[in-house]
UniProtKB/Swiss-Prot annotation:
Mg(2+) 3 binds at residues 1449, 1508. Belongs to the retroviral Pol polyprotein family. Residues 443-465, 515-525 have a biased composition (Basic and acidic residues). SUPFAM superfamilies: Acid proteases (SSF50630), DNA/RNA polymerases (SSF56672), Retroviral matrix proteins (SSF47836), Retrovirus capsid protein, N-terminal core domain (SSF47943), Retrovirus zinc finger-like domains (SSF57756), Ribonuclease H-like (SSF53098). GO terms for biological process: DNA integration; DNA recombination; establishment of integrated proviral latency; proteolysis; symbiont entry into host cell; viral genome integration into host DNA; virion assembly. A zinc finger (HHCC-type) spans 1383-1421. It holds the Pfam family RNase_H. This is Gag-Pol polyprotein. Mg(2+) 2 binds at residues 1181, 1219, 1240, 1310. The gene is pol. Mg(2+) 1 binds at residues 806, 880-881. Keywords: Aspartyl protease, Capsid protein, DNA integration, DNA recombination, DNA-binding, DNA-directed DNA polymerase, Endonuclease, Host cell membrane, Host cytoplasm, Host endosome, Host membrane, Host-virus interaction, Hydrolase, Lipoprotein, Magnesium, Membrane, Metal-binding, Multifunctional enzyme, Myristate, Nuclease, Nucleotidyltransferase, Phosphoprotein, Protease, RNA suppression of termination, RNA-binding, RNA-directed DNA polymerase, Transferase, Viral genome integration, Viral matrix protein, Viral nucleoprotein, Virion, Virus entry into host cell, Zinc, Zinc-finger. The lineage of its organism: Viruses, Riboviria, Pararnavirae, Artverviricota, Revtraviricetes.
Amino acid sequence: MGQTLTTPLSLTLTHFSDVRARAHNLSVGVRKGRWQTFCSSEWPTLHVGWPRDGTFDLSVILQVKTKVMDPGPHGHPDQVAYIITWEDLVRNPPPWVKPFLHTPSTSKSTLLALEVPKNRTLDPPKPVLPDESQQDLLFQDPLPHPPHNPLLEPPPYNSPSPPVLSPVSPTTPSAPTPSSLVSSSTPPSSPAPPELTPRTPPQTPRLRLRRAEGQDGPSTWQSSLFPLRTVNRTIQYWPFSASDLYNWKTHNPSFSQDPQALTSLIESILLTHQPTWDDCQQLLQVLLTTEERQRVLLEARKNVPGPGGLPTQLPNEIDEGFPLTRPDWDYETAPGRESLRIYRQALLAGLKGAGKRPTNLAKVRTITQGKDESPAAFMERLLEGFRMYTPFDPEAPEHKATVAMSFIDQAALDIKGKLQRLDGIQTHGLQELVREAEKVYNKRETPEEREARLIKEQEEREDRRDRKRDKHLTKILAAVVTEKRAGKSGETRRRPKVDKDQCAYCKERGHWIKDCPKRPRDQKKPAPVLTLGEDSEQGCQGSGAPPEPRLTLSVGGHPTTFLVDTGAQHSVLTKANGPLSSRTSWVQGATGRKMHKWTNRRTVNLGQGMVTHSFLVVPECPYPLLGRDLLTKLGAQIHFSEAGAQVLDRDGQPIQILTVSLQDEHRLFDIPVTTSLPDVWLQDFPQAWAETGGLGRAKCQAPIIIDLKPTAVPVSIKQYPMSLEAHMGIRQHIIKFLELGVLRPCRSPWNTPLLPVKKPGTQDYRPVQDLREINKRTVDIHPTVPNPYNLLSTLKPDYSWYTVLDLKDAFFCLPLAPQSQELFAFEWKDPERGISGQLTWTRLPQGFKNSPTLFDEALHRDLTDFRTQHPEVTLLQYVDDLLLAAPTKKACTQGTRHLLQELGEKGYRASAKKAQICQTKVTYLGYILSEGKRWLTPGRIETVARIPPPRNPREVREFLGTAGFCRLWIPGFAELAAPLYALTKESTPFTWQTEHQLAFEALKKALLSAPALGLPDTSKPFTLFLDERQGIAKGVLTQKLGPWKRPVAYLSKKLDPVAAGWPPCLRIMAATAMLVKDSAKLTLGQPLTVITPHTLEAIVRQPPDRWITNARLTHYQALLLDTDRVQFGPPVTLNPATLLPVPENQPSPHDCRQVLAETHGTREDLKDQELPDADHTWYTDGSSYLDSGTRRAGAAVVDGHNTIWAQSLPPGTSAQKAELIALTKALELSKGKKANIYTDSRYAFATAHTHGSIYERRGLLTSEGKEIKNKAEIIALLKALFLPQEVAIIHCPGHQKGQDPVAVGNRQADRVARQAAMAEVLTLATEPDNTSHITIEHTYTSEDQEEARAIGATENKDTRNWEKEGKIVLPQKEALAMIQQMHAWTHLGNRKLKLLIEKTDFLIPRASTLIEQVTSACKVCQQVNAGATRVPAGKRTRGNRPGVYWEIDFTEVKPHYAGYKYLLVFVDTFSGWVEAFPTRQETAHIVAKKILEEIFPRFGLPKVIGSDNGPAFVSQVSQGLARILGINWKLHCAYRPQSSGQVERMNRTIKETLTKLTLETGLKDWRRLLSLALLRARNTPNRFGLTPYEILYGGPPPLSTLLNSFSPSNSKTDLQARLKGLQAVQAQIWAPLAELYRPGHSQTSHPFQVGDSVYVRRHRSQGLEPRWKGPYIVLLTTPTAIKVDGIATWIHASHAKAAPGTPGPTSSGTWRLRRSEDPLKIRLSRT
């Protein structure tokens, strides 16, 4: 029988309709919300024992009623209706309340289970009734009470210990009867049961119903409230039912989501149900996961109380108090019940301990008050957050201040402002804060009030606008009427005066004008032409004929002339002329936004046909409009010609003769949706296709909640500018999504930009949202999307019928939770639809990083039933791409039908355009599948084939990535692409050479001939043929198809640097391990046979120990010696892998063990034992130690008695490096001799014998591809090994005692090396007496000898060297090498390097020339040194008269005043006249405004304007204005202020003058002083003695007249004389100035030519970046600037310098200029 939790409150809420009816009968009204609030919140606070879940105890109800109806100030009149209704439910209980009421024991019958007769055996338990039966029993009339049975007494609620009851004596004692559920011995009498309603229960107990069979009557139902209790010292036990466990599991959050809620639930279960140890285990098993259960048990064992009540640490006490295995507790005894109580106590402590999460205050700060959330609910949610994410109790007094501050800071804005203004906020408790917040919350306006307020404000704004407009119209009308009246009066403005008895018409006396017989009676006054606002029908809006093009139609029988307006979406009438419909629309016009109504459908006569149409009524519209809606029905065409616009139909005829049917005949001409599917598929499954079923929505998926990272804060990025074409392109998609509900308006602190992406090959745009910032702030989930590389491996090759479905708008099928929708908001403005604000997605958006994984998992769950019900087909899913494969066409058809049915029922939609139904050849994931084989699509091959040669490392990586997708079809891909891998690094110079071009073309050629590969069949074994060449592993994965081996994949990979340095027989082992690991993605664990040209298995089992490390060997053996999966075939020299193209011939068969045994180091005759006939025996050693924080190092070579060589090494040299140096020096000194050399360094010994050759083979790289340590010393050692005639390098133990020669020599070498390390200068070598001094003999050419003689040097006959003054003259070749080495060490300049060479013992002829040659060729120095090209001063281009050529610039003036920061300065280059305007901003709008409003009206239209490259000058606004006006806007070279020298100098002059004036006057407003500064600038003489004022106006400067007294004659100069003076100025001043300003011949001031390599200055270098970047190739030149490849702007010649010549194609040949097909382009080529 199912167990349910029923309380009085939940019972009344379930039957609230009956409660409301009963209250109505009592003449009161109750509401459900208040009923629940009073019962659970208000009445428990009255302290009368009212439980939160309600009670049917009449005494408690009466106490609450007394409190509520208290006449004093503490009464609650609003709760009277509810408590009297509750009282009536108890006094007059309905059927659904009676089973829960206790009837006082007034009858002889008591509550007792019926006895089982002694002569009857106990029947088996009856079957448990379903929940429906239980509910039916609740509504039946109560059965007569059986005799009282003490088993049915409920336990107390406050403690799980045995109850202490106050028995009520029954009127009639019950007979003693044995119970069937307890022991046979029962006391003769039992007390009456207490009342069933507890006084203050912690939780209402679950209701249990059980049926027992009476002695002589039918079975009756009895209620038992608890499963485990003490009755006559016997325990009654009822286990948990499946329905209880299911309800607890389903209707409560998991422990990981909300540990507090689940802990409270388990706590209530432990208190009310009193479970046993087994019940607790079952409860934990159902409600917790395995990991959560382990944590709870671990925490519980930490809280087992000891004898003193504190947690114990003794294992025996812990095991006794909280056993992990089932204990043998006897619950009928007090110790057993006490043990169970301790167990429950520890278990509850463990739940609370395990539920504590790590402290994360950031999570608490994210809890903010919702828009419509009450303060009490928000406080409860905040307290729950503190309990969940912090270790302290938020209700503790010491933490209330923290909670209060969080409540205030994270509350809504209006509540937060109110609480922050409270006085003494620290003294307020949490309840007081909630109470204050409730006051603000309750004062908020309701949505209805807010809407009414907005409507009222809108009406007030419209009234104000109408009154203002009427006021203006009244003024206009008054002015017009006054003018008319004045015009009618003719010449006499006033009428003649008329006497009292005189006629105003005929001027005769005796009658008035109304009785005048001469006045015509029937003449009508002509209607005046009224103006706007006059009250006349002819003058009303819309009365006149509209302009062309117009069209007259009959609307509802009334002829109406329409203005054809293609910009109007709907047709408009100015008058209703009939009834209006209830339909309204908002209309956005020039005067604002108003709501207008629509007419009912009117009949429109088109001449020969009738249509019905509904018009929008807009009285403010000047004319009736014929909009696009009616034009679309008419199929109208508008043609514009010189005669005017014509409205014609499709055939070119006037629109009046067009007939349109009543049923909108235009729909017949619509192009139907074309699909490649038969109609039967669309008709049978309309809900499965996007074309017929619309947008889908997953029916079985809950809304998705997006989790944010703990530190995530909202990000708001403004919308990028968007072109009109792009905006209109994505507008249709936005409108569609709004109509479908995929988008909705919102207000969100989050905002990301929307990007319009043009679809390739079309003019359509699609909206793409930039969600990169959102992706950074959301929690990452593990991607479960399948790998397309091995997805098809699960497809059986014999399944040759396929169906491919592509789900349409797949991500939009999954809804987003409302709390996650605001994350994806973006800006959108659409004035036509009245949208200006933010929109957000209600479905899962595209571009979100977790969308593919979330959708893939959701679709996989929804298709689980299909996979299990149809095992005869295979269904592959890659996100929204589905592939169904079947062995026959019939099976494929049936599977497809079931799949479409399943998709339609689950709410997904497939694209009919892209569907491939029941075909033998389909395209899926870029592959073509047919007959169990796959190959690349032509489109993918063409994409790779069209890729041009790369120009930088990024493009090389892009090409390799695109081609790498097809590597399974390219035999030997890694070998073909090997030359290109070196160009992928950014650190290496990019040089595209012939070998790279050949590799690039070879990959394309191999792709064009890509073969078809078979699909892997996981039911068959695989064979892998392997070979290795030049560090490239190549393989062919095959499967048997009859007698043939069909290729499944071509594999190739490059070995790592370590394995590449091994001998060939070991490289094959590394190659095999790499390809076996890669092939596992396709074989999926099936048996694999490996066949190679080597005896691979023997090498893997017993490899040589000198080549490979133990870790790598263990990895190889674990991978290759797995006999269950990998088998080795016999060595085969010719196999598919060895037949792949290689650049060298095939090797002959060999024995791998013998080859490895014969593999030697660098020198074949190098010995590790003493030579018997050695010329000398030397001992080497290196020393390195710390001395006062400095590492000192030295090296030495000794012979046991004398020091052969010793030297101190630079500080910081390691001991290994010193050992290598010492051994290398000993080998160099043994050149041409037989030598025994001892060393105690294992590192030096192994490097010379073994490791050196390995390093050399793998390019001196480590396993990570980095350079090895001591690379230069190892190279020197490997070279020095070949200098002696014979040599033996012997290892000896270090620091040995004894007198044998080896120990003595080793100790001497160690002592001398240590002494050398302590020396600060070089210790020269001391040769023994019997050893001659070694002298280097230089080789001189005839040119070297001539130069030596020229400087006075002589030849030394002994050394055969040329010497002068004790210095050796170096040959030119050796001198050049020496200078290069010294410059590489120091990078000194010419002068410093020459001084350094002069201090050496060598003399170099022509040293200055060689030094200059070396320094100029150093690329590093050219990039870093500050030297630049010096160009001579030139002439700037100026105008030939004033106002023609202007220079313009912005300059900032500090301090700012009144928001004005900048000064826009114009300088006329001819006269020097200056105009300056203060501005607040530095924008292109200001520049265009000043040109149009200031320069153009006063000085005429400029021809040329020069400026720098500031944003205000290069913007589209400025450049567009110049293009429209025909102005040549010249942008000067970047970072070259000399190009704008005139305006730059004027900026300085103006600011200097302003500074002086501010100091003199004390004014801070520099704008008031600007006119004086301009006065000085305009009257300052130039180098020709003329002021700008004189050049412009032809008169003396106004400053000269200030010194003279005023004379009236000075201002009476004849105008003609002035004009003649201006003419003379133009002839005598303007012409000579123009001649002086002429630039003359344009001579090139720099040495750069087209095709040269130059470095370009980096103007803003950061950190340690070089000062110069490049080199670049010069494409174009001018006399002062150059244009280089790779930089868009022109570069001034002073910002470039020549790069040192490098050999290659750019160093020879000439450039030739050719024309191209495009007249705006030229072609450069080298010959």
